[in-house]
Swiss-Prot record:
One of its GO terms (cellular component) is nucleus. GO terms for biological process: positive regulation of DNA-templated transcription; regulation of transcription by RNA polymerase II. It comes from Mus musculus. The keyword Nucleus applies. Induction: By IFN-alpha and IFN-beta. Upon stimulation the regulatory phosphorylated alpha and beta subunits assemble with the gamma subunit and translocate from the cytoplasm to the nucleus. Pfam families: IRF (PF00605), IRF-3 (PF10401). Transcription factor that plays an essential role in anti-viral immunity. It mediates signaling by type I IFNs (IFN-alpha and IFN-beta). Following type I IFN binding to cell surface receptors, Jak kinases (TYK2 and JAK1) are activated, leading to tyrosine phosphorylation of STAT1 and STAT2. IRF9/ISGF3G associates with the phosphorylated STAT1:STAT2 dimer to form a complex termed ISGF3 transcription factor, that enters the nucleus. ISGF3 binds to the IFN stimulated response element (ISRE) to activate the transcription of interferon stimulated genes, which drive the cell in an antiviral state. This is Interferon regulatory factor 9. Residues 118-189 are annotated as: Disordered. Residues 171-189 have a biased composition (Low complexity). Interacts with STAT2 in the cytoplasm. Forms the interferon-stimulated gene factor 3 complex (ISGF3) with the heterodimer STAT1:STAT2; upon stimulation. Its main location: nucleus.
Amino acid sequence: MASGKVRCTRKLRSWIVEQVESGHFPGVCWDDAAKTMFRIPWKHAGKQDFREDQDAAIFKAWALFKEKHKDGDIGHPAVWKTRLRCALNKSSEFEEVPERGRMDVAEPYKVYRILPAGTLPNQPRNQKSPCKRSISCVSPEREENMENGRTNGVVNHSDSGSNIGGGGNGSNRSDSNSNCNSELEEGAGTTEATIREDPVFLEHQLPLNSDYSLLLTFIYGGRVVGKTQVHSLDCRLVAERSDSESSMEQVEFPKPDPLEPTQHLLNQLDRGVLVASNSRGLFVQRLCPIPISWNAPEAPPGPGPHLLPSNKCVELFKTTYFCRDLAQYFQGQGPPPKFQATLHFWEESPGSSHSQENLITVQMEQAFARHLLEKIPEEEKAALFLLQHTEQSPSALGH
């Protein structure tokens, strides 16, 4: 048997051909008679019928070949899969053939084409910086979208809107809205600078179609009385809809009993509360005279209560910080990141020793945050793990 050092200098192409020809790996076989395309089983590691010794065998073999895993070590099939996927997508000798793969069957598989020497894949592969190579390794299925639509991505969300007043006619906005707009514009530079500091992770975690819709939960006296989802970039929380010419969506509080104290408080809601949910995070602006305290990931230190100022835009949740904390959590370096913001409506301004229960509470969150934290696939978690190690060792995924 050749030494490990010799094996590591062999080409990925030769290794792949050898494994397909060997017949040792279930599901790994030629896809055409000319032996120019091959299949790789691609079952999700979280499936109940996942069999590591079969469904992950080829990926584990690649990890052993590259000396990234030793027999007896505790490894993760999703990490092994991501390593081989990265190697295939970085190589100029292979290209995926999506139309021949089947991901909607009991035994899903992908198909890759082995390109003749001297040819190029159908997708032009421009010379990439190390940063962009890392992006394509982490999320190759999104590479085309990111390369063709990068100006509409996370780094420059011109379509997401930074105005809490939304995308309607500016002439319909109040002066207070304009003030909030300018404050958001001032904060945009800081947010985008933070994004640029970690572009790889953000472009991976926040694809172009991320769901920034707003999830609202209304609570009266400690009891949930209603939930709704707002898909527009901004909205106004009101007691009753008005015939305003503004194009901003109006979201009504659930109707309590007319004699309840909650109704008396809602009668004072007046112009309501503006809420914006976009790629930068969650923002609110109090226009009503009701005292409102808030608790959110961006709350200042101290026990509070933290009161919303009148007619001033306040940032409750920042997507960049959430993604940073999410990566640390998946790497075992921190707790699950917080993503919920809470507004408490009071009959009178609460002090530091205020013990009276507030009558109205509104919980809000962005849909994408809960999705990433609770439902992100194991393969994506593995990609985050690999990303950090790739940045520490740029050649870790080479071949």
